[in-house]
A protein has these predicted regions:
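Active-site/substrate-binding loop(s) of hydrolase catalytic cores
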Residues: 1-105, 124
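C-terminal accessory segments enriched in acidic
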Residues: 42, 71-79, 85, 90-278
Length: 278
């Protein structure tokens, strides 16, 4: 684990408030200095860069969460494809084929914008084939149990018959056919909600998103209102048709961004932490 202090505090940043995944080239932090030393000593044939991914990501063209996303990171600003990057692509294609048997259309391809301070981009620039794994959301699996299973399947399939890592003509095409992952999900969307805005009744949609909060060494999911209206391009992992019922929260009849998603509809139907409970 590169960032034990950050893992303990449930944050990307280390004890010096530095995001280590933006420190690969500069190596200003002791953790990154140590990783660089280990890299030089070990001289790996491949690097696997494992991350979690937020629930907001889905696969482009499909109304499905991006449960696992991959990337063969770029080695230059033009995002060209060289032999090093193609070796990573061969492995990604192998993992994608394995996962399609379990979670079809829920495998995404991460954005390949180049930043040499990102760990994967740095190692690719150093001519080591590198694969980024992003473990995302599976339907109603907020504890990521299913996601971990599919990461394991990915890792196992990448290691089987790895001696056959031969680059054939259609490898790049197959890689680029993996749908781009994009920001298209909220944890909750509430549709057809009546509000009163400046004494005018309106029907709107609004969304809530979980904040992951560390309390007493436990992670708690706290739903907060995150977007009001303009949700045509988004889907919810959970969606409610509120059938023109009136929103109310402590006497206020309009949802406010940043407030906890605890409210009533028609003063009768209760939502607590985003979820309908009555």
């Amino acid at each position: 684990m590169l960032n034990p202090d950050g893992a303990l505090a449930y944050t990307r940043e280390n004890a010096n408030s530095v995001d280590l995944n933006r420190d690969a080239y500069l190596a200003s932090q002791p953790e990154m200095k140590l990783l660089r030393i280990l890299y030089e000593e070990f001289k790996p044939d491949y690097c696997y860069n494992l991350h979690d991914q937020r629930t907001i990501f889905g696969t482009e063209g499909f109304n499905l969460p991006a449960t696992i996303s991959f990337l063969a990171p770029a080695f230059n600003n033009d995002r060209d494809y060289n032999e090093v990057r193609m070796k990573a692509i061969v492995i990604i294609n192998k993992m994608n084929r394995a996962l399609q048997e379990y979670i079809p259309y829920q495998i995404g391809r991460f954005d390949d914008s180049y930043n040499v301070n990102c760990t994967g981009d740095y190692f690719t620039t150093r001519n080591t084939p590198t694969i980024l794994f992003e473990a995302g959301h599976f339907q109603m699996d907020y504890d990521r149990d299913e996601s971990r299973k599919y990461v394991f399947i990915s890792l196992l399939s990448s290691l089987l018959d790895n001696y056959e890592n031969v680059i054939v003509d259609n490898e790049l095409d197959n890689y680029l056919r993996i749908p781009q992952n994009n920001k298209r999900f909220f944890d909750f969307i509430y549709k057809n909600v009546k509000i009163i805005d400046n004494s005018v009744e309106k029907i709107i949609n609004f969304a809530a998103q979980y904040d992951e909060v560390l309390e007493n060494n436990e992670i708690y999911f706290k739903a907060k209102i995150s977007k009001v209206s303009d949700l045509e391009e988004y889907s919810g992992h959970t969606e409610y048709d509120c059938e023109s019922m009136l929103f109310s929260e402590n006497g206020i009849n309009i949802p406010e961004i940043g407030k906890e998603a605890n409210f009533y509809l028609n003063n009768l139907t209760e939502f607590n932490n985003g979820v309908k409970i009555i």
